[in-house]
Amino acid sequence: MKTTRLLMTAAEMERDPETWLTLRKTYITGTDAGTIMGVNPWKTPLMLYHEKLGDIPAPEVGDSDAVHFGKVLENVVAQEFTRQTGIKVARRGIMASLYDPNRAASIDRICLNTDFPAGLECKTTSAFKAEDWADGKIPPHYYYQCLHYMAVMYGDAVGNPVVDGAGWYIACLIGGNRFIYRHIPYDRQAIKALVKAEDEFYKRLIHHEPPPVTDSANDEKLLAALNQGTAPAKSLDCGMEELIARMDDIKLQIDQYKKLLQAGRNELIAFLDQSDTAVGHAYRVSYKMRKGREVVDMAALRKNTQLYQALRDAELLKETAGSRTLIIKEAKNG
């Protein structure tokens, strides 16, 4: 049973990246899945929401060396996967679900000679990220990306039967010299949970209802960029005042732990005495003198108006963009 239609071939995606970017913005895609599930280490649901609405620019495809070389090495990863497994693969392009017009999949490869439906996701990463793949692990955002592809390609969101053994492969070149691959088995319950979360996110887009903020500092940066503070003052309701009270309690606990931590540092430094190193069974401690760094006395520089202006004219002095600062104080009664 046919479950998808082809939106763009792989060759068309290379020739027309602007249309590709537009499609990625229009549909819920595989790279969105991990973000929607809250496991993307670089992007929050709120960031994705505002990207989809065009409030903030989405990262350009190929706008970094990592992305560029990831695409260059995609063929290498696919070829090595075939060499090690004997499974032939082919490029396909962007596929849209026939059963859900809001979901699409920009898949790297389709597997051709398996006894069950399968695809291949090709990844590259640095040696510093090797631990993310150790002992059979798969980074969670990549796991959900592959589940999304299965949801689109197999049409299970509407209850279509799926062939036994169906799944998705993911292969990764680590540090340029280590190759691994994993098979992600088809998991009906996990896919249904993902589809439900994606549908709820899409409804938020339609109704312009932002997802809740997370504990990520990225959300604070995003909100500061979106909201310039030009509206009239607001009244704090009971819920917000209770939130501030909880924050005060947390800050008090943090202060207490900071004091305990500082006491521990002081005791350790006192133990070192005139030594700059101490070694034990579990830990190694160093307390060495660092070279001082040069600093600019801005107050003195501004007094030398001629030199100060010359540095600004030469663009050796630059002013950063202003930012909003959150300050909480007790209200004055009466």
Where in this protein do the model-derived segments appear?
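Accessory terminal regions of nucleic-acid processing enzymes
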Residues: 1-334
